[in-house]
Regions:
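Histidine-acidic metal/acid-base catalytic patches
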Residues: 1-139
């Protein structure tokens, strides 16, 4: 399941919206794909069961990438959000893997992955995602 070709093969096994997948913006970019185009392809087939909304900087697909703040990476998250709105996507958008911010560090809050943030970072991610949704809805 590590390539877009594998995703397409898997989703072609059973032609049903119940045969869907989690669309992860970051993983899609880590594979070297265009998250907006992949979102469009999956969404037009009603195959997105859940969205993981995160951003990355990729230096070498599959091998060398860094997770970054939602507003600071190579994924066109606003483009993805506009595509989800265009599709009238009705399910969950989860802004995952918050990055560490000062207030979390000062409180000693740590997460299970390198550079991961805590409560304030989660709030930042949710607020940023919600604002992006509102902006996409007004366009």
């Amino acid at each position: 399941m590590g390539t877009l070709a594998h995703w397409r093969e898997y989703l072609g096994l059973v032609e049903s919206p119940f045969n869907g997948m989690t669309f992860d913006c970051g993983v899609t970019r880590e594979m070297g794909e265009d998250p907006v185009a992949v979102c469009r392809w999956l969404g037009e087939r009603d195959r997105i069961n859940h969205v993981h909304f995160r951003n990355v900087v990729v230096r070498k697909p599959y091998v060398d990438y860094t997770e970054v703040f939602l507003d600071d990476g190579q994924v066109d998250l606003f483009g993805v959000m506009k595509e989800l709105v265009r599709q009238k996507y009705p399910r969950t958008i989860y802004p995952e893997h918050p990055r560490a911010i000062d207030v979390d560090r000062e409180r000693g809050i740590k997460n299970q992955y390198p550079g991961g943030g805590g409560f304030a970072a989660e709030i930042y991610n949710v607020a940023y995602t919600r604002a992006m949704l509102q902006a996409a809805l007004t366009r």
